[in-house]
């Protein structure tokens, strides 16, 4: 009798359409993301879950975890079981391969645009009327200006601020020594370093600390929209391209049987619907039609890449981000 029941079950499974068989994985996945992406991925998840249900018949829940990108990477290495990561810095995904062998070496080649479905740049949020007349990076090191951004030792967001400021100073001032002094003054103008981007936003917006919040352009626009008439966005003439890399955590999805779901989730970010959601939250995207639709939202800016300014992430890690390297030296001497 048991054999008959087993045979019937197998036959029934074989008769299911491929999409339904695909949905046989777990009914939950975990997206571990950077600190200021909560609202964005709530919107993404709602749309993806609806599409997944229509495609597979499965009721899916996408759970979210948010903190500073580098802290999240460490948590995954220490055992947090993320099915997917949606980070704001390439190095925080790469470390999952280098230190935990949790993602494949070719993770950046698995999806378009170096596995970065959207991008942004460090920009400035100032109080209404721009009372300190902030226009560019060199305004941020004036004695009368106080800044707010997270700790670059724990926040990928803040590392982009550090790298963008350093690249600007080195190009304009012409030497590493002068760039070092510029960044030390930048750090000295920060009265408090929060651990992540959202905490820094709270410090600036709710506690009313500082004259300028430096964060991703997407976050500055979101805050401006949330508090009409209280803030304005300043996009500097030049900034650093901030890619937002995504990846399935191979060891976790293979262990949980969630690879198909995780892959579909990341693929969704590249669809017209996914790109539209990303752009609605003020992220710059790659889909030409979506770019055209939202072009008035994004002022022109010269974006420098990490390759152009620093020779790539490997060099940045060794020369700037490693323990005792440039960032540590400048941060401690601020």
Model feature map: region roles:
Residues 97-171:
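A conserved helix-loop-strand patch within extracytoplasmic ligand-binding domains
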Residues 107-116, 138, 224-240:
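Short beta-strand->loop
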Residues 172-237:
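Ligand-binding pocket segment of bilobal, Venus flytrap-like solute-binding proteins
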């Amino acid at each position: 009798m048991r054999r008959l029941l087993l045979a019937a079950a197998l036959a029934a499974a074989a008769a299911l359409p491929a999409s339904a068989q695909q949905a046989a994985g777990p009914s939950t996945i975990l997206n571990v993301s950077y600190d200021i992406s909560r609202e964005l991925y709530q919107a993404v998840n709602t749309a993806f879950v609806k599409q997944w249900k229509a495609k597979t018949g499965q009721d899916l829940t996408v759970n979210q975890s948010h903190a500073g990108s580098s802290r999240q990477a460490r948590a995954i290495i220490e055992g947090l079981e993320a099915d997917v990561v949606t980070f704001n810095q390439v190095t925080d995904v790469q470390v999952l391969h280098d230190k935990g062998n949790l993602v494949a070496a070719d993770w950046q080649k698995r999806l378009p645009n170096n596995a970065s479905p959207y991008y942004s740049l460090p920009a400035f949020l100032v109080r209404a009327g721009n009372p300190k007349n902030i226009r560019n990076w060199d305004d941020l090191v004036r004695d009368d200006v106080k800044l707010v951004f997270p700790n670059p030792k724990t926040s990928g967001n803040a590392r982009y601020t550090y790298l963008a400021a350093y690249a600007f100073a080195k190009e304009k001032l012409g030497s590493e020594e002068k760039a070092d002094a510029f960044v030390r003054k930048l750090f000295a103008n920060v009265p408090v370093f929060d651990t992540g981007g959202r905490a820094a936003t709270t410090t600036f917006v709710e506690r009313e600390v500082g004259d300028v919040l430096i964060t991703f352009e997407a976050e500055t626009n979101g805050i401006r929209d949330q508090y009409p008439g209280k803030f304005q966005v300043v996009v500097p003439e030049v900034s650093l391209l901030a890619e937002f890399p995504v990846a399935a955590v191979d060891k976790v999805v293979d262990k949980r049987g969630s690879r198909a779901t995780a892959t579909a989730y990341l693929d969704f970010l590249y669809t017209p619907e996914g790109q539209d959601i990303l752009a609605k939250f003020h992220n710059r995207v790659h889909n030409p039609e979506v770019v055209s639709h939202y072009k008035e939202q994004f002022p022109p800016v010269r974006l420098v890449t990490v390759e152009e300014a620093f020779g790539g992430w490997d060099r940045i890690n060794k020369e700037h981000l490693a323990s005792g390297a440039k960032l540590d030296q400048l941060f401690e001497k601020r």
